């Protein structure tokens, strides 16, 4: 399991969303990773071993008008531990970070990219409970083995070619080898292919929020000489430079993009897209990071991964029922929901049980309490028929 886009996730566990419900779900979701062995049923559930949750903490660079201004009140409202660090404390903890204000983001072929900063950042927002998961593909294998221990069966290397229906509700799926799988409930969790699966179910045009596949690159570069970022680094969200980065094995730094407006978005066919790292994007992301990380070079050899986000119209996921009874969706995850695997599964299970028992979720949106924090999550917030949320970052930040 997990050899789709999940295997190339940056697997960052953070709480810096733009909305109360987004932050609440992410904080609840973190507790699944912190309790991973118990959640799965014990340390021996997977012969390949269990993933590690590296709880390094996250620092978010605070620049004037930055994303932290939206995040801090949400952290406070949910009593999520956080600290404000001065520039001095930030550089004491991570001495290789520079303190200039570089935004708004530009590309290296723009003269504005090379202008020396004249302002200094405010400091950093630190959340000690966040971090990253060591191996996203292994984490899905962990879940596979735990599910199999509870009686689940997995089928691989087959394509769904039809969503079967009978009497106005779903009745199962047909696979490309002719296999018919009968099921009273079907859940679309097809990632970047989710809109195609919805089309198979005859649901095109029935939702107010749509999804489509976005090509994205993540790059790997060596840590600057003299600093071991793998052991001494942490997850850094730098909206001012339009990148985020975290430790990677082999004393490398993994660099992702925070989707600045100057970068052209590549909407693609999920079955046919360029899977090679592009020189222009390689230079843009690595050089942006090099502004913040002193001594970071631009290697000649490009290393990293190319994969897809399943992006909703407002970069907020859709966790909902559909107009086809028995057919549910957990889609539009927009590159920011890996961390929520556990809590999203809990919410979907509660939703499915309630709707199948007769609850009218569209008229009376279900509210679900987190199993760890007890926080109440309003599933109406993730409705397929919501209006586009103006509070969203409209980026991977959610």
Where do the model's predicted regions map?
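Flavin (FAD/FMN) cofactor-binding and adjacent substrate-gating region
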Residues: 63-150, 155-156, 162-169
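Active-site substrate-recognition segment that forms the wall
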Residues: 1, 11, 35, 41-57, ...
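C-terminal lid/capping helical subdomain adjacent to the catalytic/cofactor pocket in oxidative enzymes
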Residues: 84, 323-398
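Mid-domain beta-loop-alpha active-site segment that forms a flexible
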Residues: 125-145, 191-193, 240, 277-288, ...
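FAD-binding beta-loop-beta segment adjacent to the flavin cofactor pocket
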Residues: 96-99, 105-117, 298-343
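Dinucleotide-binding Rossmann-like beta1-alpha1 core, especially the glycine-rich loop
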Residues: 10-110, 242-244
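Active-site catalytic microenvironments for nucleophilic, acid-base chemistry
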Residues: 35-39, 146-150, 196, 200, ...
